[in-house]
Amino acid sequence: MLHRKIYHLALAAMMALPASVGFAEEAPKVVRIAAVVYNIAGKTTYLNGAAVLTEGGLEETLAKKGVKIEWVPASHSAVGPIINEGFASGKIDFASYGDLPPVILNASRPTVQLVAPWGRSGNSYLVVPAKSKASTIEDLKGKKIALHRGRPWEIAFANLIESKGLSFKDFKIVNVNPQVGAAALASGTVDGFFGLNDAHILEQRKVGRIIWSTKNSPPDWKLMGGLWASNDFIKKYPELTQTIVTAYVKTNYWTSQDANKDKYIKEYATNALPEEVVRKDYDNDIVAWKDRWSPLYDDALKTHYRRVASYAKQSGLVRNEVKLDQLLNPQFVEHALKELNLEHYWQSQQIKQAQLSPAAGKGK
């Protein structure tokens, strides 16, 4: 009788536990994390990889659990498609990338969730040839603009043209990756190029001139990507997911401190781009350095992703609607902030949503 009572009590206790805790599987031996890869002077480096290993202590923490990290390279020329394919085929568990590609991936079926936002840190730029007389987006109406469709900065481009009463149909969009787009601008094949901070390299080489950027635009026009995790991995290994997210939040905290800004730029950011280019990207920005690295799931982030999901469908990039609660999973960041005593370090931001008309993204 006593044994039966103990059995029922134990069973009741197990059923009372959250599913993610009660049925977590034994940790895998390897965690596969995809990230943008750069080859600088024959040395392979991963975007944010070195920082999270050193300042976040990820490798050391996982080693104590008997888990190794396998970095999976994603070429800068096609980050979104490569990572989306990796998630879809089950070849990766985590990935650090931008906001539009994972929305496109989840439109087929819920596959990934954002478990650790990297903040509001990505600027987009409109560049014209150095000798071009164009000074505004309106000056490029009817002309060729190199833009890689389906990449995160497409949202910023759509915001820009829609704010001027224009649409994709007002331009001849050349859908090529950033490297090809930059080369096309340098050779005079296109009249404009829309991309990320490598726009400063075009200026540095005196082949391009930046005429617009998101630096002084509404903060929600910036890229808001982060660390995404496979739904299957989250379900099987919630504790390990928490360990990884905590390391990323710890890295964000370290990076966000003004005292560490120079070290971050010199030792980590410059693994991909020259220091001068990195500093130009960060200087004179409407978003403060600390806030650039906020991992909060605040109204600003939710509004941004609601807009991204809406734009993806309106523009014809996806057929199915993507629900916000299938994209965002704040529980791991919330736990990490408590564990690291950072609950009040970052402040939530409310950002007025940029209204995108369906016409802005049409005309592929």
Where are these regions (language model features)?
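Secondary-structure end/capping motifs
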Residues: 38-43, 237-322
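Ligand-binding cleft/hinge of the Venus flytrap
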Residues: 49-68, 154-172, 205
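Pocket-lining segment of extracytoplasmic ligand-binding domains
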Residues: 174, 179-275
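Flexible hinge/capping segments at coil-to-helix
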Residues: 129-144, 235-239
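Segments of small-molecule ligand-sensing domains
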Residues: 26-31, 279-364
